[in-house]
Curated annotation (Swiss-Prot):
<keyword id="KW-0812">Transmembrane</keyword>
<feature type="transmembrane region" description="Helical">
    <location>
        <begin position="8"/>
        <end position="28"/>
    </location>
</feature>
<dbReference type="GO" id="GO:0008324">
    <property type="term" value="F:monoatomic cation transmembrane transporter activity"/>
</dbReference>
<dbReference type="GO" id="GO:0005886">
    <property type="term" value="C:plasma membrane"/>
</dbReference>
<dbReference type="Pfam" id="PF06826">
    <property type="entry name" value="Asp-Al_Ex"/>
</dbReference>
<feature type="transmembrane region" description="Helical">
    <location>
        <begin position="37"/>
        <end position="57"/>
    </location>
</feature>
<keyword id="KW-1003">Cell membrane</keyword>
<keyword id="KW-0813">Transport</keyword>
<feature type="transmembrane region" description="Helical">
    <location>
        <begin position="164"/>
        <end position="184"/>
    </location>
</feature>
<feature type="transmembrane region" description="Helical">
    <location>
        <begin position="506"/>
        <end position="526"/>
    </location>
</feature>
<feature type="domain" description="RCK C-terminal 2">
    <location>
        <begin position="293"/>
        <end position="376"/>
    </location>
</feature>
<feature type="transmembrane region" description="Helical">
    <location>
        <begin position="478"/>
        <end position="498"/>
    </location>
</feature>
<dbReference type="InterPro" id="IPR050144">
    <property type="entry name" value="AAE_transporter"/>
</dbReference>
<dbReference type="GO" id="GO:0006813">
    <property type="term" value="P:potassium ion transport"/>
</dbReference>
<feature type="transmembrane region" description="Helical">
    <location>
        <begin position="409"/>
        <end position="429"/>
    </location>
</feature>
<dbReference type="InterPro" id="IPR023017">
    <property type="entry name" value="Transp_YbjL_put"/>
</dbReference>
<keyword id="KW-1133">Transmembrane helix</keyword>
Length: 560
């Protein structure tokens, strides 16, 4: 049986798409030392080569890809978007705007000075900033008519310029950002480890950010004379058992009767108490608790320890510090804090925002009591609320179609902005109403990534025909300009953050990387800081940066 692969791919466009995806994703896993190409650039390079070899596909059919991608970006940003001005939020907003304004200004000025073709500058900026939303915003402005294509060009040629510019600049942007993360602290003689420790000391973090996470365990002890002497007649509230031992007294058996103690309870000789705490806390208990006094009573030990993810929802909690929760009052143990899918240091001074996820363990009723106070327990269902997902998608498209008129000028926001706004709204509502609009994070990631990959395949196959012509004509020039656009805004943002905003350097480097939406560079900064504290800064800028980058692509292509 003979199979003509070329003919097979020509006649089966769906097969072509997934062949390009499979090859591109495999290429994206290639590493050069610590540098990985990544899925986006792998798929784009593959689709450009396939397009150059003569394979084609109707790019219009793949616009659903960028629509899904930008919609999911909005959903992820929604819970934290409106909390951007909490505590350091203004600093993060200023840094994101600094990178954006500097990049757009530089790209606009350099592209006009060197006479870059229409569309090439937007693609170059998207690659130099490793920010795919720039590319999405630019193409949507073309599709919606916000940007006017020059008379001597057509849509397909502009699309070629966008994709080739992105492909040529992306690696420059990625490498330069990683080098920035490695070299600038040394050039400035900054010790990121010291900066991280400084924040830890100022905010009461200590070493908790690096501790391993365990489930608490239950052990029971009989109260003897030594323990009575230790309590000195004080009640449980006065004793502060948790402060001294790291364990909570969950139950007391007295005269055969089981009870849940309150703060006024006073221990008596012969009581049997059930303590809940981490294994190391039990090991550190005073000998008056442990020596020969452990008991094994099934009824006393019959407690259900659970670990739940609690989503912050309460207006009374959002904007307050983690320490204000007083977890010791609830008998709960905090294991992790996650914001925008980024694990945060266990900083007692971190300001909580709606949508933050606290991984908490403890006795079931206590954990549920805490959840009622601060928000809700995250749904562990594998079912998505597709009705809400689709409805808000429709609203986003409809909003993007609305035409506004100012005098003689009429314009619409376009699909990208409309879907961003509807996605942010859905994400925000999801953070406040646990049963509404739920989409499992894994499903959301898959839709977002697959949408982005479809988008890359579409523009790559459409643009690949003249790829090598572009490389020979403007390749060196675009690469040089991409380096400038990648590095200069970052340096400006560093100067603003360090000398005007006077930010801690560990937070500043994390924030700049978030403003550049360059996740690979975060590993470098965390390694240099010997801490996850820079993630505080990264999470602060990442959500707003994704939104601003989309708008930047729209603005730049209109100005061009």
């Amino acid at each position: 049986m003979n199979i003509d692969v070329v003919q097979l791919l020509d006649q089966n466009p769906i097969l072509l798409i997934f062949v390009v995806l499979a090859i591109g994703l495999a290429i994206g896993k290639i590493r050069f030392g610590n540098l990985q190409l990544g899925n986006s650039i792998g798929v784009l390079i593959t689709s450009l080569i396939m397009g150059h070899l003569g394979f084609s596909f109707n790019a219009e059919a793949l616009t659903i890809g960028f629509m899904l991608f930008i919609y999911c970006v909005g959903i992820e940003a929604g819970p934290n978007f409106f909390g951007i001005f909490f505590r350091d939020g203004k600093h993060y907003f200023i840094l994101s705007m600094t990178v954006l304004v500097a990049a757009v200004s530089l790209t606009y000025g350099l592209s006009h000075y060197f006479g870059l073709d229409f569309g090439l500058s937007a693609g170059m900026m998207a690659g130099a900033l490793t920010a795919t939303p720039v590319l999405v915003g630019a193409q949507d402005a073309l599709n919606s008519g916000l940007a006017t294509i020059p008379r001597n060009m057509d849509f397909s040629l502009v699309l070629e310029n966008l994709s080739v510019g992105y492909a040529m600049a992306y690696l420059i942007g990625l490498i330069s950002m990683i080098m920035f993360a490695k070299l600038l602290p040394k050039l400035q003689k900054q010790n990121l480890s010291d900066s991280a420790q400084q924040i830890a000391q100022e905010r009461g973090l200590g070493n908790s950010s690096q501790r391993k996470v365990y489930l608490p365990i239950i052990r029971a002890y009989r109260v003897g004379p030594e323990l009575i002497d230790w309590t000195d007649g004080k009640n449980l509230r006065e004793l502060g058992i948790y402060r001294q031992t790291g364990c909570y007294i969950e139950r007391i058996r007295r005269n055969g009767i089981l009870a849940h103690p309150d703060g006024d309870a006073i221990l008596q000789e012969g009581d049997e108490i059930a303590l809940v705490g981490f294994p190391d806390s039990h090991a550190r208990l005073d000998p008056s608790f442990r020596n020969g006094k452990e008991v094994f009573d099934r009824n006393l030990l019959d407690l259900r320890i659970v670990e739940e993810e609690i989503v912050v929802k309460s207006d009374a909690i959002a904007g307050k510090r983690l320490s204000d929760l007083n977890l010791s009052e609830f008998g709960c143990f905090l294991n992790r804090v996650v914001r925008a899918q980024i694990e945060m240091p266990m900083d007692l001074d971190i300001v909580l925002a709606k949508g933050d996820v606290l991984q908490v363990s403890g006795e079931k009723s206590r954990v549920h009591g805490l959840a009622e106070k601060i928000g809700f327990i995250s749904i562990h269902s594998q079912m998505a609320d597709l009705l809400a997902f689709c409805s808000f998608f429709i609203l986003g498209i409809m909003f993007g179609l609305v035409t506004m008129t100012f005098g003689q000028v009429s314009f619409s926001l376009g699909n990208a902005v409309g879907l961003l706004l509807s996605g942010i709204t859905l994400g925000f509502l999801r953070a406040n109403h646990p049963t509404f609009g739920y989409v499992p994070q894994g499903a959301l990631n898959m839709v977002k990534d697959l949408g982005l990959m479809f988008f890359m395949v579409g523009i790559g196959l459409s643009a690949g025909g003249k790829m090598f012509e572009h490389l020979t004509q403007v390749g060196p020039q675009v690469i040089g300009l991409a380096f400038i656009v990648s590095v200069v805004p970052v340096v400006i943002a560093y100067l603003v953050g360090a000398y005007i905003l006077k930010m801690n350097r560990a937070l500043l480097f994390g924030a700049i990387i978030g403003a550049r939406t360059c996740a690979p560079a975060m590993d470098v900064v965390n390694e240099y800081a010997k801490s996850t504290i820079p993630a505080l800064g990264y999470a602060g800028t990442y959500a707003i940066a994704n939104i601003l980058m989309t708008l930047a692509g729209t603005i730049l292509i209109i100005l061009s």
